[in-house]
Amino acid sequence: MRPRKAFLLLLLLGLVQLLAVAGAEGPDEDSSNRENAIEDEEEEEEEDDDEEEDDLEVKEENGVLVLNDANFDNFVADKDTVLLEFYAPWCGHCKQFAPEYEKIANILKDKDPPIPVAKIDATSASVLASRFDVSGYPTIKILKKGQAVDYEGSRTQEEIVAKVREVSQPDWTPPPEVTLVLTKENFDEVVNDADIILVEFYAPWCGHCKKLAPEYEKAAKELSKRSPPIPLAKVDATAETDLAKRFDVSGYPTLKIFRKGRPYDYNGPREKYGIVDYMIEQSGPPSKEILTLKQVQEFLKDGDDVIIIGVFKGESDPAYQQYQDAANNLREDYKFHHTFSTEIAKFLKVSQGQLVVMQPEKFQSKYEPRSHMMDVQGSTQDSAIKDFVLKYALPLVGHRKVSNDAKRYTRRPLVVVYYSVDFSFDYRAATQFWRSKVLEVAKDFPEYTFAIADEEDYAGEVKDLGLSESGEDVNAAILDESGKKFAMEPEEFDSDTLREFVTAFKKGKLKPVIKSQPVPKNNKGPVKVVVGKTFDSIVMDPKKDVLIEFYAPWCGHCKQLEPVYNSLAKKYKGQKGLVIAKMDATANDVPSDRYKVEGFPTIYFAPSGDKKNPVKFEGGDRDLEHLSKFIEEHATKLSRTKEEL
């Protein structure tokens, strides 16, 4: 027994020793793994540090320093003057400019003290691009003691070097702003004395105003060089509240043109060259003088638009001055003419002190007067002249074109007849043949506007009307005040068929044509999908509040809004009286002009019982908080309190 016990004892001792060895090996392996992990982390940190060091390091390429968001501020902090170029790698002008810029860098490097020349890839250094308002490539700026000076000269070595050397002088200071600053103390004096001046009413906190500011100043500099100069001015509307109220300033920035103190709306662009071109055009006379009878005859024979002529004694005639003032109000939409010629007055069968409005020969007809006359005196109101011109600006049946659509054919209902419209010599007779058929109907419906339109110019509209495959040479449609469209059934066109069509519309017997995607088979999601055919049944449902988003599939802002909009719909899912909906406005008609879509996304709240007065979501962030607040402010059917929501 003793040997057996001894054997067992030895066996147990061996197992204990084996376990001890295994236990000793385990910790060594774990320790090794931990050490490896620590080493990997240290290597990653070193790599990150290397990348940060790479970003902070100012590299040089052919004498030009390379700056970015990370190293810019450190580099320029102690520099008096730095030349900067903001470029894009794909920009052709930047590539052409690169060799010249490298020469400039080498020249300025030799200056005592040397002036650093740097470039910034604005497509990757987005912070700097935004900070320095970079909107085009290449953009050149000179940094003087940390303040950016716009370079507006040519991209030549000589001119850039000269400007940099000028700015680098110790006594150089930026030139004062050319834009005049107006207050209630000097406003009337400055504005009343100017033949023409542009005034911006702004708010210091307004983002759009800040964006406009550099362009406005550049335009002011450019226009100050003209002879005579055209001044630009600005008014802080938050400080000068009386001036803002006096000129009905309700948003920022508001721009107005003043001519000897008389205000006119500014409807031009908001960037340097657009402002300059617009103001140069506006500074010219609103009416051009007609010197010869031949000019009038050419207007009548070859003209393509309404002819407006004022006949006066001379430039000192008070009636002429009043006519000029009225012309300024409409100069963007119509061409005004005047004459002091008695020969022309006799030809037009008018007297001095009269305004005549007439159509070129191709738009005249036996159903309407050849011309319309109005007496103009020094006391005649601008509005009276304006109303007269607008009343007779269109012929009984005019030519609707893409170029005049927005200015001439906005009145509804509009009856449009589509065919191959061509007033050139070879095709004029055919064009007038079909137009004469339209005239026979138009004379009996003075409350409607009639026009002919070339079917190719309006191919998209014809297709939306379902008429592109009609098989007929002539088609017709009616566009009404609410945005609805009505197509005439394809059949051989003549005056009788058009008359029947217009009469049926007048009696409300026509069904509108609505461009629409197919009605969704499954529309049970939190966000209801609206198409053209279901707009009335969903959005215009008088028993429900509806929040409707009009979107475009390609719109980036719409894509960003989608998850927020889905969350909003889920939040209010239990509200049976509220519908959260969306509609692809590029693939569906919006059959109501109350819901105007001028950009994407556009959001309206259509309250129950008042669908003709939807509320547009404007001004706030398109996030869950603001959209929820918008709903709760206008909802009529919420079953819970705001606190519960």
Swiss-Prot record:
Biased composition (Acidic residues): 38-58
The protein, known as: Protein disulfide-isomerase A4
Family: Belongs to the protein disulfide isomerase family.
GO terms assigned for molecular function: protein disulfide isomerase activity; protein-disulfide reductase activity; RNA binding
A Gene Ontology term for the protein's cellular component: endoplasmic reticulum
SUPFAM superfamilies associated with the record: Thioredoxin-like
Locus of motif Prevents secretion from ER: 642-645
Quaternary state and interactors: Part of a large chaperone multiprotein complex comprising DNAJB11, HSP90B1, HSPA5, HYOU, PDIA2, PDIA4, PDIA6, PPIB, SDF2L1, UGGT1 and very small amounts of ERP29, but not, or at very low levels, CALR nor CANX. Component of a complex containing at least CRELD2, MANF, MATN3 and PDIA4.
GO biological process: chaperone-mediated protein folding; protein folding; protein secretion; response to endoplasmic reticulum stress
Segments of this protein annotated with the region Disordered: 24-58
Residue pairs linked by disulfide bridges in the UniProt entry: C91-C94, C206-C209, C555-C558
Post-translational modification N6-acetyllysine, affected residues: K366
Motif (CXXC): 91-94, 555-558
Annotated compartments: Endoplasmic reticulum lumen; Melanosome
Organism: Homo sapiens (Human)
Primary location group: endoplasmic reticulum
PROSITE patterns found in the cross-reference section: ER_TARGET, THIOREDOXIN_1, THIOREDOXIN_2
NCBIfam families the record matches: ER_PDI_fam (TIGR01130), pdi_dom (TIGR01126)
InterPro entries hit by this protein: PDI_thioredoxin-like_dom, PDIA4_PDI_b, Prot_disulphide_isomerase, Protein_diS-isomerase_A4, Thioredoxin-like_sf, Thioredoxin_CS, Thioredoxin_domain
Catalytic activity entry: Catalyzes the rearrangement of -S-S- bonds in proteins
Residues annotated as domain Thioredoxin: 21-169, 158-301, 505-636
Gene: PDIA4
Pfam families reported for this sequence: Thioredoxin, Thioredoxin_6
